[in-house]
Amino acid sequence: GQIDFQAPDEGTGTDAILKSASIQAVSEGDFSSSFNRTSLVLNTARSAAVGSAGDGGKLTLRSNGSMLLKDMRTDANAPSFILQTGNTNVAQDDVLGAIEFQAPDEGTGTDAILVAANISAISEGDFSSSSNATSLVFKTGASETATTKMKLSSGGNLSLPTDSVELAFGNDSDVKLTHVADTGLILAAGGQTTSDFGTP
């Protein structure tokens, strides 16, 4: 089935009276006694009838829960997904937007249903006419609601706030740089310590 949106009586005519948007339920294959997979497709138009090649945008929600966002224009444009806050007075540590990852229906419950990972944009201070300083914060959880493990500041500084954090390099992680709380850094290769950068 399909729902179309149109302004057929628009006085300016031409593009203005064409179908400008649609919602479609589209089969993902031949229906059978064991198959009725269907995608929900939202189409928008810019200067042609909705669904025309090379025009408008398309959002598809598939039966497996995946989502596809496509800019249908052919002139090298790329689609964007924008998270906006309605906050009119952004202060320090306000979350401007976040993406969370969770398995809320996991049968074992407890920790299993908590937010397992999170990517947030968090303000570094009060916004003003000359400042919108924001950090991108990456959170993960092991047996907890996800907590901050890495932060990229507005100035480009990368911080890893967890003690004993380890950076691994190479396909086999054969070179590792490990932080030791209140001590310094240890550089190891092939399981052997090669350098120890202690605090002064």
Segments predicted by a language model, with ranges:
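Short Gly/Ser/Thr-biased coil->beta-strand turn/linker motifs
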Residues: 1-9, 16-25, 36-45, 51-105, ...
